[in-house]
Amino acid sequence: MSIGGLAGYLGAAGFDQVDRKTLADALGHEVARGRLRRVERGRYGRGEIAPRTRYRILARWRRSFPLSRNLTTVDADERRTDDGIPVQTVYTAQDLAGWDPEKRLGQPGKPPYTRGVYPTMYRGRPWTMRQYSGFGSADATNQRWKMLLANGSTGLSCAFDLPTQMGYDSDHPRAEGEVGKVGVAIDTIDDMHRLLDGLPLDQITTSMTINSTAAVLLLLYQLVAEDRGIPAGKLGGTIQNDILKEYVARGTYIYPPRQSMRLVTDLFGYCRQYVPNWNTISISGYHIREAGSTAVQEVAFTLANGIAYVEAAIEAGLAVDEFASRLSFFWNAHNNLFEEVAKFRAARRMWARIMTERFGATDERSKLLRFHTQTGGSTLTAQQPENNVVRVTLQALSAVLGGTQSLHANGFDEAVGLPTERAARVALRTQQIIAAESGVVDTVDPLAGSYFVESLTEAVEARAWEYLDKIDGLGGAVAAIEAGFMQDEIERAAFAYAQAVDDGSKVVVGVNAYVDGEVQPLDVFPSDPTLEAGKAEQLTRFRAERDAAGVDAALEQVAAAARGTQNLLVPMKAALACRATLGEVSDVLRREFGTYRPAG
């Protein structure tokens, strides 16, 4: 593009006049700095202006030229978020024309909760630093947790291995090769005792990332506490218990959706009666994003699942204000800092509206979208792994600026395996540096009122409502999942993202740009080759030392409850107290409920 073409471009964009002399001066500045000469030796011909240089010329010209009413329409090159939301070069007050800050923004801790769920947010206390951890044996995970607590972690978060997630004991043939690999292996109440050894369960909160077998793990946790003389009413924590996203994004489901929803709502009712301070679900967008969704899809599909859980609980006989205050959410913090901040703010505002208008909630606590955040695991790269420290820092910062209640920062080595102790410590220190050194905790919602952030928040929300309307038209989240709608949308988004990385239009430093060819040595977390055999021996002894007839009778009560309408967690707890294993309880429900196989 020549100077005449550049001036014409600006004129066509809606400017009443174009000061060509000022523009020529800006162009001359670039020539004087040698930038155009360098460009001419590259792929742009003589007399042509490269896009980056054109961008600098426009920026310098704008500093000299009075602002026009159409300034926001000028772009040297079009920019969009991964959702396709256009990003302008400059945002002004005109981009928020007609926008009512009292209605759309409000005050922190008050409707519509855009600015946060609590009036003082981090001025009151920092977010909970809850580092996700779990691997190998219960003893090994217990030691890692104690290390994290000693280094300043303020909450626990447990990762379970795949057999535990899928309801198989460690000696089951289908567990072979997976025991303790991606999380801790928990089969029995003895395992849970070892996992929680020496931890003050009445003083800390524990989050458990578990879904199909959520009820079993929660009950084992409760039984251990009771064995120590700690009443269930003093226990605090969160159970993920979000089975719908398993059908959409992860795949660790066991039973058909509708039977799984019964387990979810039975857990709601059980906790309301017996474990009142426990968050009964963590409605999860994290895994939806990890599967390849966009930020808008993450919001829309997660809130759609949330609507389905509320509807199911009401259908099960619970009043909305009896359970909704214990609902929580779990989001991903991805790479685009401002889009992520907008996502968190939009989701909070949308949920308050859903609970008020759709479900008639009157307790303000029922309207609060309280959430945990984890930095985006899928963004980490095996190439130049130290770069991941920077990625994690920016992602964690977006979660804090977006008002998270708790946060996990990934280890920089998680693209190649479980985090080493060093990587876990660096991740925790990342959170502590943000909290103690950056100043972001000093004022609530520091980005409020930004022309860009508020415009982006509005755009994310508007597009998410469009998705929710489509899902409602399909009959709700369960019907949309059964029809494959969410899965198809995520697949298309994931393909588009991968294609952009492949063709270089989406830059990933160290992967498709700034590749130096140097292989950086990296310590890899070692797995225990003796664990699987050792777990099998433990299970053999465990079964031999218990009252087999008592276990069988207790499991029959679980089966009878599954055939009826009784809350399943009551007989499940009795069976686990009789020393039934996780796999045995799950097998009873497999026989009664069947297992789910997706169509096609």
Task: Pin down the residues of each PLM region.
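Short acidic, hydrophobic short linear motifs in intrinsically disordered regions
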Residues: 2-10
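Short, basic interhelical loop/turn and adjoining N-cap
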Residues: 12-18, 581
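Charged low-complexity interaction tracts in eukaryotic proteins
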Residues: 16-58
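Catalytic alpha/beta active-site cores
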Residues: 61-334, 339-340, 358, 365-372, ...
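Flexible, glycine-rich loop/tail regions that form catalytic "lids" or insertion modules at the edges
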Residues: 71-72, 77-98, 107-111, 162, ...
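Short beta-alpha connecting loops at secondary-structure transitions
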Residues: 177-181, 245-255, 288-293, 331-339, ...
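Phosphate/diphosphate-binding loops
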Residues: 187, 205, 210-213, 225-227, ...
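Flexible glycine/proline-rich, aromatic-decorated loop/lid segments
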Residues: 319-323, 361-375, 383-410, 415, ...
